[in-house]
């Protein structure tokens, strides 16, 4: 069979002394694999399988620098470093770079934890619901500075674990502070664009100082007129990105802002958004900065991914659901077998639905996904068709 074009996807690129083996990125996703915030054997199997399949850059999503209730990895104590190091070593064995996405939720973690420890569950629920709407406006400057300190400490721990990249999460609390919809503050963190992005810029500069030799990736969460709330407005995104480069950002992951409650905004099922629906916006950022940019959003086959690279709209192609459906993208492309890639159908049944129901990430097209340590599938390939 004729092979789809894949030119450019196998090209290497370099940042801050790190060499990335190709242009294929697994973006930050909530997986549900962590046990009480600890890196689990399920994590190890899943991310190692992606690395073995040829992914060049993996980002571990939603890594919390505090002991939060988020069902995500946590790195707030030195005792957690060895598990992250084991994961980094495992993916490094296949030449893959590992990033951790550091975030802080949009609620007062210490207050919520205190109510939980006192078993005041009704009050805790009320406080959480309140904070999700108003913490952005009510957090004191002292608290915001404390959050920056904790995120920097998390970055240092990640560096000690051998992680290659720190990705700053541009959504959640950080994105809410940037947002014209969520930020109603009247102090130096609210109002004008310069004020709304002040926290993000202070955070970026602080992390740059804390880990001067590491690659800093920034998830640039953008609100469009149609979708999203907790991020920078599309009209302000270029200026914001240029400021962040001045502050020390080495690369951008351009994505739809997802603080909205509507998962179809950022993880659109079939028929809801066109293929590559955020690529043009990534291209607008790329034109304005001199650092690599990754694009994401319904990029589902090798030909489409190659066109993103060839067109100059992005330097890196990030694919979440497509790599759940087939983790062997990289090796199949390298072998000239791109037509064997199992294509994601955007059904959202094994992935998004599972996470929304507090289960773990899986895929209806890939029986291994989430069970990498106990299952192995023999896949049909074009070689078999030629026999």
Model-derived features with residue positions:
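Catalytic cores of alpha/beta
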Residues: 300-312
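Alpha-helix-loop-beta-strand connector modules within alpha/beta enzyme cores
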Residues: 77-96, 186-214, 269-291
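Glycine/Thr-rich beta-alpha phosphate-binding loop at enzyme active sites
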Residues: 240-283, 287, 291
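Single conserved hydrophobic/aromatic residue that forms the stacking wall/gate
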Residues: 2-13, 380-387
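Glycine-rich, proline-tolerant flexible connector loops at the mouths of alpha/beta enzymes
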Residues: 60-80, 104-110, 168-191, 255-273
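Conserved, mostly hydrophobic/aromatic
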Residues: 26, 50, 54, 91, ...
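Cysteine-cluster motifs in flexible loop/terminal segments that predominantly coordinate metals
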Residues: 333-379
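Non-globular sequence segments
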Residues: 103-161
């Amino acid at each position: 069979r004729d092979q789809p074009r894949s030119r450019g996807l196998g090209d290497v690129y370099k940042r801050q002394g790190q060499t990335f083996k190709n242009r294929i990125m697994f973006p930050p996703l909530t997986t549900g694999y962590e046990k009480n915030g600890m890196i689990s054997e399920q994590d190890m199997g899943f991310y190692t399988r992606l690395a073995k399949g040829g992914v060049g850059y993996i980002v571990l999503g939603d890594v919390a620098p505090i002991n939060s209730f988020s069902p995500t990895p946590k790195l707030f104590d030195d005792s957690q470093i060895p598990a992250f190091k084991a994961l980094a070593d495992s993916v490094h064995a296949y030449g893959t770079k590992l990033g951790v996405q550091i975030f802080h939720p949009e609620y007062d973690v210490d207050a919520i934890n205190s109510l939980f420890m006192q078993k005041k569950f009704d009050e805790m629920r009320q406080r959480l619901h309140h904070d999700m709407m108003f913490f952005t406006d009510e957090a004191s400057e002292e608290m915001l500075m404390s959050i920056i300190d904790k995120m920097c400490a998390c970055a240092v721990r990640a560096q000690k674990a051998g992680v290659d990249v720190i990705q700053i999460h541009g959504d959640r609390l950080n994105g809410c502070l940037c947002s014209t919809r969520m930020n109603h503050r009247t102090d130096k963190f609210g109002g004008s664009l310069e004020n709304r992005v002040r926290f993000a810029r202070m955070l970026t500069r602080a992390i740059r100082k804390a880990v001067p030799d590491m690659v800093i990736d920034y998830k640039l969460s953008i609100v469009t007129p149609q979708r999203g709330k907790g991020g920078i407005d599309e009209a302000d995104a270029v200026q914001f990105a240029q400021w962040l480069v001045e502050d020390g950002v080495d690369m951008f992951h351009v994505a739809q802002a997802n603080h909205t409650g509507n998962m179809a905004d950022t993880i659109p099922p079939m028929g809801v958004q066109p293929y590559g629906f955020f690529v043009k916006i990534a291209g607008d950022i790329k034109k304005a900065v001199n650092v690599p940019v990754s694009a994401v959003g319904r990029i589902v086959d090798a030909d489409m991914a190659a066109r993103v690279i060839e067109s100059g709209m992005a330097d890196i192609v990030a694919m979440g659901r497509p790599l759940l459906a087939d983790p062997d993208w990289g090796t199949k492309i390298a072998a000239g077998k791109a037509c064997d890639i199992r294509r994601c159908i955007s059904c959202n049944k094994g992935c998004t639905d599972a996470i929304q129901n507090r289960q773990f990430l899986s895929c209806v097209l890939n029986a291994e996904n989430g069970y990498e340590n106990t299952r192995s599938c023999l896949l049909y390939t074009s070689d078999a068709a030629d026999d």
